[in-house]
Amino acid sequence: MSNTKTASTGFAELLKDRREQVKMDHAALASLLGETPETVAAWENGEGGELTLTQLGRIAHVLGTSIGALTPPAGNDLDDGVIIQMPDERPILKGVRDNVDYYVYNCLVRTKRAPSLVPLVVDVLTDNPDDAKFNSGHAGNEFLFVLEGEIHMKWGDKENPKEALLPTGASMFVEEHVPHAFTAAKGTGSAKLIAVNF
């Protein structure tokens, strides 16, 4: 999904401030995140590579805050209130689960004015619901709309999930931190949906 550079001075300072505010040292935060203290220190120094939206959400959750509170204030990237993304500017990312191409994310236009809004067109490449790979539930609510094909949706308890078959035109709302997974319906090949995280 969307990547945010940890080199941002704003993120580094906000992370350090929040960690200190909740009285955690590097080791305590690292332990809760499954990272090393050196990694946390690197993030606070504006180093450490890139973090995904999911990783930022996990850090925010552990620190009892929001992704927005850990990111610098938005600048204005709009032109008289509008931003346009042309087709050749659209990032395309592969979602891989257990070394299998699972999704292709076509990242739609984003703006600094609404940094938590992440709109995607998702090509769902697997059609075996038995192989559905649950996420752990992410920060931010999610809206889904099925554009093509049928989606087999699972959510909640991974061992005893709730399930629904969503035909073209169906939509669904998923509350933040609810584990979920979706595949194309069994034997249908693939499907396509719009997903908006906010």
Swiss-Prot record:
Q: Identify the residues that the record assigns to the HTH cro/C1-type domain, covering every copy.
A: 15-70
| Keywords, sorted A to Z | Antibiotic biosynthesis, Dioxygenase, DNA-binding, Iron, Metal-binding, NAD, Oxidoreductase
Q: Name one GO molecular function term.
A: ferrous iron binding
What's an example GO cellular component term for this entry?
A: cytosol
**Residues annotated as domain Cupin type-2:** 136-196
Highest rank taxon of the organism: Bacteria
**In this entry, which stretches build a coiled coil?**
none
Asked if the keyword rRNA-binding belongs to this entry, the reply reads no
Query: Any further remarks?
Result: Phosphinothricin tripeptide (PTT) herbicide and fosfomycin antibiotic biosynthesis pathways share early steps starting with phosphoenolpyruvate before the pathways diverge after formation of 2-hydroxyethylphosphonate (HEP). HppE is involved in fosfomycin biosynthesis after divergence of the 2 pathways.
Family membership, please give it: Belongs to the non-heme iron-dependent dioxygenase family.
What does the function comment of this entry state? Non-heme-dependent dioxygenase that catalyzes the oxidative epoxidation of (S)-2-hydroxypropylphosphonate into (1R,2S)-epoxypropylphosphonate, the final step in the biosynthesis of fosfomycin antibiotic.
Quote the subunit structure annotation. Answer: Homotetramer.
Q: Per its record, how is this protein called by name? A: (S)-2-hydroxypropylphosphonic acid epoxidase
